[in-house]
Amino acid sequence: MKPLVVFVLGGPGAGKGTQCARIVEKYGYTHLSAGELLRDERKNPDSQYGELIEKYIKEGKIVPVEITISLLKREMDQTMAANAQKNKFLIDGFPRNQDNLQGWNKTMDGKADVSFVLFFDCNNEICIERCLERGKSSGRSDDNRESLEKRIQTYLESTKPIIDLYEEMGKVKKIDASKSVDEVFGEVVKIFDKEG
């Protein structure tokens, strides 16, 4: 059985992680956050990638695609090896740019099917406020205004064109993420009840 993938995209602070947690609970998907996998790998003293990842994350840059895909693939393989029924994955914060998308197509072509792209559309200022609020308790080194403005810039220049590309293929489900968590999830449920 091949993995069925939903890409979850949106700017920093659009609520991707929060909504993914709820989708997992209600629909039994496995949530893979590209950013989280990279952050965990960075902390792993045995990792061959740790220092490199640290450098990219600190500078607000996008980590080389080979690293990210190998981590995502490892997680999908492990999940499905443990339980063959668990073949539905939410991949959050990926693909972030053209390079990511090409890398995915090259490595995963025929090995995984992308059902659709869930796009959380959110006003930049709202996103920044949410992240600054989160930064007070998250301890994430990139939840500060300077890093955030860089991340939003990167998102607009690199990720938005990917969303537009999938839009042309009719694969994007767009949600207004500036509303409350419950309202946003209400919209998510409508999509997943239909798409599954």
UniProtKB/Swiss-Prot annotation:
Free-text note on domains in this protein's UniProt record: Consists of three domains, a large central CORE domain and two small peripheral domains, NMPbind and LID, which undergo movements during catalysis. The LID domain closes over the site of phosphoryl transfer upon ATP binding. Assembling and dissambling the active center during each catalytic cycle provides an effective means to prevent ATP hydrolysis.
Modified residues (N6-succinyllysine): K106
Protein name as annotated: UMP-CMP kinase
Annotated region (NMP), positions in chain: 33-63
Biological role stated in the UniProt entry: Catalyzes the phosphorylation of pyrimidine nucleoside monophosphates at the expense of ATP. Plays an important role in de novo pyrimidine nucleotide biosynthesis. Has preference for UMP and CMP as phosphate acceptors. Also displays broad nucleoside diphosphate kinase activity.
GO MF annotation terms: ATP binding; CMP kinase activity; dCMP kinase activity; nucleoside diphosphate kinase activity; UMP kinase activity
Span list, region LID: 133-143
Pfam families according to UniProt: ADK (PF00406)
Cited InterPro entries: Adenylat/UMP-CMP_kin (IPR000850), Adenylat_kinase_CS (IPR033690), P-loop_NTPase (IPR027417), UMP_CMP_kinase (IPR006266)
Binding residues for a ribonucleoside 5'-phosphate: R39, K61, I62, V63, G93, F94, P95, R96, R140, R151
Sequence similarity: Belongs to the adenylate kinase family. UMP-CMP kinase subfamily.
Subunit structure: Monomer.
Lineage: Eukaryota, Metazoa, Chordata, Craniata, Vertebrata
Cellular component aspect of the GO annotation: cytoplasm; nucleus
EC numbers, comma separated: 2.7.4.14, 2.7.4.6
Record's catalysed reaction(s): CMP + ATP = CDP + ADP; dCMP + ATP = dCDP + ADP; UMP + ATP = UDP + ADP; a 2'-deoxyribonucleoside 5'-diphosphate + ATP = a 2'-deoxyribonucleoside 5'-triphosphate + ADP
Gene: Cmpk1
Keywords from the UniProt entry: Acetylation, ATP-binding, Cytoplasm, Isopeptide bond, Kinase, Nucleotide-binding, Nucleus, Phosphoprotein, Pyrimidine biosynthesis, Transferase, Ubl conjugation
Organism: Mus musculus (Mouse)
Textual note on the cofactor: Binds 1 Mg(2+) ion per monomer.
Binding sites annotated in the UniProt record for ATP: G13, A14, G15, K16, G17, T18, R134, K179
Localization (cell): Nucleus; Cytoplasm
Transmembrane segments: none
Crosslink feature (Glycyl lysine isopeptide (Lys-Gly) (interchain with G-Cter in SUMO2)) location: K73
Cofactor dependence: Mg(2+)
Any one GO biological process: UDP biosynthetic process
Modification type N6-acetyllysine: residues: K43, K55
Disulphide connectivity of cysteines: none
